[in-house]
């Protein structure tokens, strides 16, 4: 997130600082690739002799509108994991100051450098939901997101919380599970 009104001070960054870090990675010879390209490289053992970075942004925070044009100028692919409930422009999580992309804003993002994946209907840990609730959350979110021309069948678990049964639910929905490590993006 690129907004000081974010839920907590640990999950946002000033845009200028982010740009400096990205440019430093470029100077270091890092190649930026899409999540789908990374998945293909992992599946086919093609990661040899290169440094790669994949940018993913969870939730659909409205501050993405401030950085996505710059990432596109730099030809850097990005994956957005979206919570569909917040696309209505009026539903917010715990912080009413925190704004989210609207349905119209998300569906205007059609650059080939942007991929759109699922993050659940609401920002709730899978393991805090019953299996039925989790499955319904995923289905509701996919019903909205699969209409997007840049939709990819990937689901990022909220805070990386999951278990084998939830992985099976995603598999039945033909979704690739995406995890974070150590609650760090």
Give the positions of each predicted feature.
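N-terminal pre-catalytic segment of deacetylase/amide-hydrolase enzymes
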Residues: 1-53
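Extended catalytic core of nucleotide-activated donor transferases of GT-like folds
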Residues: 34-36, 62-68
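Catalytic-core region of carbohydrate-active enzymes that cleave or remodel glycosidic bonds
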Residues: 172-182
